[in-house]
């Protein structure tokens, strides 16, 4: 369970909301309304102006940041490392090295494993970053505009992965300007 209590940020929003396990929520709103900031606060990267964020009844300021996997505008890839090295790096942080090959297989990355990430197109870099969702075992996914610039096939793979995460008890929060294609998703408007 993820709970936001009187969460405020620069007069952009004031939230009291709880996200239950097995939920998918799209965060919608105009540009500059605080969607990315909200996700960064939940990830523990930014601090709110006031209020508290609890994950499994613990204040996120008091727990290790491994409770979530956050993918934002900065994809978190090491450009000089190969695709395989990047996935292995992240999976080892989360103590889930065995999941690297599942990520490679799911996104069909076999032919790219030895390529340096800087040599990939921006769309393929994003897929490698998204593959971290499989390689890093966390129950809370925070995805900031990850659907942007994905091919139709890769967007379908991502949506399927999101639904599988929710079906296994995970919580997924996404910001997106695109129309939600996941019918079971809730919409949170913060504009």
UniProtKB/Swiss-Prot annotation:
Catalytic activity: heme b(in) + ATP + H2O = heme b(out) + ADP + phosphate + H(+)
SUPFAM superfamilies per the UniProt record, alphabetical: P-loop containing nucleoside triphosphate hydrolases
Keywords of the record: ATP-binding, Cell inner membrane, Cell membrane, Cytochrome c-type biogenesis, Membrane, Nucleotide-binding, Translocase, Transport
InterPro entries: AAA+_ATPase, ABC_transporter-like_ATP-bd, ABC_transptr_haem_export_CcmA, P-loop_NTPase
Coiled coil feature spans: none
Positions contributing to ATP binding: 29-36
Compartments it resides in: Cell inner membrane
GO biological process: cytochrome complex assembly
Enzyme Commission numbers on file: 7.6.2.5
Function: Part of the ABC transporter complex CcmAB involved in the biogenesis of c-type cytochromes; once thought to export heme, this seems not to be the case, but its exact role is uncertain. Responsible for energy coupling to the transport system.
Name under which the protein is recorded: Cytochrome c biogenesis ATP-binding export protein CcmA
